[in-house]
Amino acid sequence: VDVKRLVCDFSAEIQNLKWTHDTLSFNTPSIDMLFESTDSTINGALHNEDLSLNFGSQVGLQQFIDKMTKCGNIALEQVNSISLNIDTLQSSLPPFACELEMGKRGIVQQFLGYNDIKMKKLSFELYNDTTIYGDGIIQGIDAYGTKIDTITARLAQVGKYLGYRFHMGNRAGTMDNFASATVKGGMLGSR
């Protein structure tokens, strides 16, 4: 670990985790974590039963933090002036790839279940290389007694335009008033 340069190589494996607090109880056979940071890359991973989270960037941690701070300031300025410029936001973001897969088993799912939320599958990916791209799906949601079969989301940048598509699909008997709903659109700099 080099704290001054924000360079590190960390990995951990937790076996047979059991945690109880009041009425909240978690139990999982293992959690694996990895975080590596060099002057020019970041790699991170978290794996727990059906949960897999992977993150990577082709910049070092200090540059990543600096770029995220700059992007946050640019986004705030654009929101305040009611003028979005997606290509300016994209170019101020650090390059990254983030991928998340989650099934029915794991510590996150136990926490959601404790809060009366269940889902069969969550899959999500978000990238920023030369453009912003994101794609995700949630299947078999049951939240506080409300059931939804499938929700999908997609983001795709083309120049200054960020297109989006959100879809909810349900079979008969599941939220019949919203059996199938799709919202498509985009954001482009405007005043």
Give the label of every model feature segment.
Residues 1-66, 73-82, 96-191:
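Hydrophobic lipid-interacting interfaces of membrane-associated proteins
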Residues 82-92:
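Surface-exposed, low-complexity/disordered segments
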